[in-house]
A protein has these predicted regions:
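UBC/E2-like fold recognition across ubiquitin and ubiquitin-like conjugation systems
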Residues: 1-92, 101-190
């Protein structure tokens, strides 16, 4: 597979996007004068569009780690803050989104990463999230932003910080990719 992401140092005069039939160049003067050159395929164009939207107008408490995205368009780190007035107020979390070339027809792989994995009845201690829109209920109409809002809402509605009852056995026996898990969605009351 070809490496579709290359970085070059140059001196741009301002932020701009230059497109041709096969390549997009995103040039940002504010970010170390780097150029991001990407081959244009449908899934990459969709990711670029979602990324620009999320950077320009992020939902409250959600921010893209732009350094992670500049390294690899197929893996995004998203920072999420606990909503004020909830059990997670003042806490900071990180989500890792992994995309494949079937996106948006195939859902991204989404997990919590880092030292602070939320203690929640639908979040396992390894960062896997039991949320139907990440697997069975995924639709190409959904986006990274809608996933972030769903996860933020899931955290905000939680009434008790506790792990799923099967956390211990699941973490020991699960696949590394949570999308390969056959989830049973039986509890929407947390």
């Amino acid at each position: 597979m070809f490496n579709r992401l290359r970085m070059r140092k140059e001196k741009p005069s301002k932020s701009e996007t230059i497109s041709t039939a096969t390549t997009t160049v995103i040039q940002d003067a504010a970010k170390d004068n780097k150029k991001l050159i990407l081959d244009n395929s449908r899934w990459e164009r969709r990711l670029q569009k979602e990324l620009m939207s999320l950077i320009k107008e992020p939902p409250p408490g959600v921010a893209v780690d732009e350094d992670s995205v500049s390294q690899n368009l197929t893996q995004w780190i998203i920072n999420i803050d606990g909503v004020e007035g909830t059990l997670y107020e003042g806490e900071h979390f990180q989500l890792l989104f992994k995309f494949n070339n079937k996106y948006p027809f195939d859902s991204p792989e989404v997990t919590f990463i880092g030292a602070n994995i939320p203690v929640h009845p639908h979040i396992y201690s390894n960062g896997h999230i039991c949320l139907s829109i990440l697997t069975d209920d995924w639709s190409p109409a959904l986006s990274v932003q809608s996933v972030c809002l769903s996860i933020s809402s899931m955290l905000s509605s939680c009434r008790e910080k506790r792990r799923p009852p099967d956390n211990g056995i699941y973490v020991k026996t699960c696949n590394k990719n949570p999308k390969k898990t056959k989830w049973w969605y039986h509890d929407d009351s947390v």
